């Protein structure tokens, strides 16, 4: 190795690439000084980030543990096996594949394993809280398959299981997807199982948003009821950004393994798999159950206070971490609301609501989630303060004095509940 090469690989980020180091520093400052209410985001532990930023980044490992196409895999084999065993223990599954790079990749692998192009699938309409990968026409799931979308009841804004059953009886899907990206109520997986059995369909649960709540036992588990379960490993699970597939029947295992590799991916990201293993280990600890209980209680407190302030919440409340505001109650679009809360350092996202008259680029809703701020230590009282800041900003959009007051209150909350307070990120040294 030349002196110049040795020197270059031993430089820290700040010395090697000050432009990227500075931008990472700015992002850390943003996370520390803003209230993160995007429902799909959370704050991973330092241990998770240390694993992901390790020398495992260097290792290629196509295949499965003990069945690799490359040498030198003895240590990544042990890491991946540990991740698999922890995932199985955490969710009570018979089998797990920890290699999917994302939840979308996990869903695609399931489709590849169980379906043929042109088969019929059923999934929750995106505008009613579903996900792009559940049959949206802009996603491969909507291009390859005949999609029948179910929705929520117009009055209750909850899933109508009898209406879903009638759709299934009419269309005889080969696969039914139950899962969501913006549905604030408990999913009845047993009822979906009964419908799937009645029409002879496979049942896929996408629990990406509620995986941490399921792991902690504060939301019913889909694993006993579904042929296959997919999830991301971040969101409420608080791990690295990645995917996971679980199932209860070993007969399906080989199909799903092959659908991941070589069917839809090449080499796994072993540094991310190590970070997943760390996150699964954290979720197996008693403290994670307490955390998840607080996530749900905090969401209820947030929803109740916003309703009391005159802002409608879809379905009238929440059973999980998601609070979806229907801003038609205050004559505002989601796009405008997103901008208003952003300028007081609250991060959320505009979102469609059921039967939304606005386009997906405008929307009538604002989606909030409690996982990230609960990680920072926010309790129900703090979330009521957050709700008041949001309400004050949305109900007084033209008042500069209110805007400045909201900024000061957000700053005080951030100082009261610091993020990564012990030290700056070591990667920047």
Swiss-Prot record:
Pathway(s) of this molecule: One-carbon metabolism; tetrahydrofolate interconversion; Amino-acid biosynthesis; glycine biosynthesis; glycine from L-serine: step 1/1
Subcellular location, record wording: Cytoplasm
Site annotation Plays an important role in substrate specificity: residues: 234
InterPro entries reported in the protein's UniProt record: PyrdxlP-dep_Trfase, PyrdxlP-dep_Trfase_major, PyrdxlP-dep_Trfase_small, Ser_HO-MeTrfase, Ser_HO-MeTrfase-like, Ser_HO-MeTrfase_PLP_BS, SHMT-like_dom
Binding locations of (6S)-5,6,7,8-tetrahydrofolate: 126, 130-132, 359-361
Similarity annotation: Belongs to the SHMT family.
Subunit structure: Homodimer.
PANTHER family tied to this protein: SERINE HYDROXYMETHYLTRANSFERASE, SERINE HYDROXYMETHYLTRANSFERASE 1
Name of the protein: Serine hydroxymethyltransferase
UniProt organism field: Parasynechococcus marenigrum (strain WH8102)
